[in-house]
Amino acid sequence: MNGISEYHSVELKDERCKGCTICITSCPVEAIRVHNGKAHILEEKCIDCGECIRVCPNRAKYAVSNALSEVQNYKKAIILAPPTLFTQFNERFSKQDIEQALLNLGFTKVYQIADNTAEITKASAAWLRHHFEQEKALRPIISSNCPAVIKLIQVRFPSLIEHLLPIISPAEACAREVRSL
């Protein structure tokens, strides 16, 4: 499948689907079809952007996630916390308060993805400087930070794959660092 992940975070509740086609017209990669009055996701086309979840008036689509209680099943329950997590709360809660709440929920360690941002930014800047020094430098260069954008390019615009910045995202750098521990 062109290196595209086979795991999909969007699923359907058939009993809620009314076949209204709103999700079909909203899907940026045309990954939804209606058969027998029910929507079906074409997994090989889905980029997991979540747009169908957002627009479905019947809440027939949902994001697959693990129950928070499953954290207890792991010896090492590590969370990679994106910067946006900390902005979701009232300013009276510090990062330390939020991290402590995550630990209280059962996570054994909290890693902040933002800690890898400076290193990735430097690597990206160095790559771009070197790249644009070349006479026939490929343009535009597209950020590789968003998994949905990467899947969109792989599925819908494969001719743009070579335009993706070949530097891993801060989230991927954080995940690799944690795996190496």
Give the residues covered by each predicted segment.
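Iron-sulfur cluster-binding cysteine motifs and their immediate structural context
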Residues: N2-D14, K18-E43, I47, E51-N66
